[in-house]
Amino acid sequence: LTVCIHYTMSISRQNLSILIVTLKSENVIHQCIKSINKDMPIIVVENSSNSKFKEDLEKKYTNVKCTLSFKNLGMGSGNNLGIKLSSTDYVLILNPDVILETNTIDEIILAFKTIQDFAILAPILADKNYPNYQLDQNNEFSIQTEKAFKVKNVDGFAMLLNKKKLENILSKETSNDEQNYFDENFFMYLENDDLCKRVINNGGNIYVVPKAKINHLAAKSVDQKFADEVEFSRNWHWIWSKFYFNKKHFGFLKAFVEGFPRFFLSIFKYLFFLLINNKTKKKIYFNRASGFYNATIGKPSWYRPNFNE
């Protein structure tokens, strides 16, 4: 006679860490940290060698431990590093420009009592005009409820990972390069979409908790004095990541057919802004074309923003 006992670790303040990946985020991260309960451990992965940033954070906040990566790892790799450093079963990933409401964590803990089978759980944006999730086709009216409901995808700026559940789900994958939580081939954009799709494809569940609300400043993670450089980087990586995501999950042909019109339009706009000598727009559309070209020939996501002051 074999008796199987299933143990489920519950979410509590002691069993939940906050993870924030940063780069040039000094101007916004303090709002984020101050919105988090002081008794909760916070892991900050700073994608640079900025020791002053680390010292200032750890001096000001006793619940913060900052790790320097010494180079810009990007979001996926930075999150993987932070998750590996965490000692809790649950990790809430936040962008530094996210602000929790007073009861956000409490509502997440309460929701756990009714949905223990989740791999990923997400709070919801307080502004209902900008949903941070995509619904399943059969669940289109779930937004009407206050109860947690299943979705097929959540945005990466606020997502709670059930580490043990994810490890079990992702162990079904055979590709050696996918043993991390996030696929590190993504430097920026769609690493969260990729993780969500892998979870769903392998039988996992993703939920949104409507009572757990957050505010997102949106595109404010990096100091605004680097706005142009951030914009150049975003345009390169969005096109590269979109092609890579589609190729990975749907094949090269779909990725090419969907991406080529953007590539052609980017070339046209690049030439136009070259003629009228608009350097910023010229660079944006050059980067879009470059991102597509590099993705099609199989080059890695190599572009890095230049933040030299």
Which residues does each PLM region occupy?
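Short, well-formed alpha-helical segments that are part of the catalytic scaffolds
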Residues: 19-38
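A conserved acidic beta->alpha catalytic loop
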Residues: 35, 46-54
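Short beta-strand/loop segment that forms part of the nucleotide-sugar
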Residues: 40-49, 67-69
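Conserved donor nucleotide-binding strand/loop of the catalytic core
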Residues: 57-77, 83-85
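Acidic/His-rich active-site region of diverse nucleotide-sugar glycosyltransferases
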Residues: 73, 77, 81, 98-188, ...
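Short aromatic/hydrophobic "clamp" motif used to bind/position activated sugar donors
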Residues: 91
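Catalytic donor-sugar/metal-binding loop of nucleotide-sugar-dependent glycosyltransferases
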Residues: 179-180, 184-187, 193-215
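Non-catalytic, C-terminal membrane-associated alpha-helical segments of glycosyltransferases
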Residues: 233, 237-240, 252-309
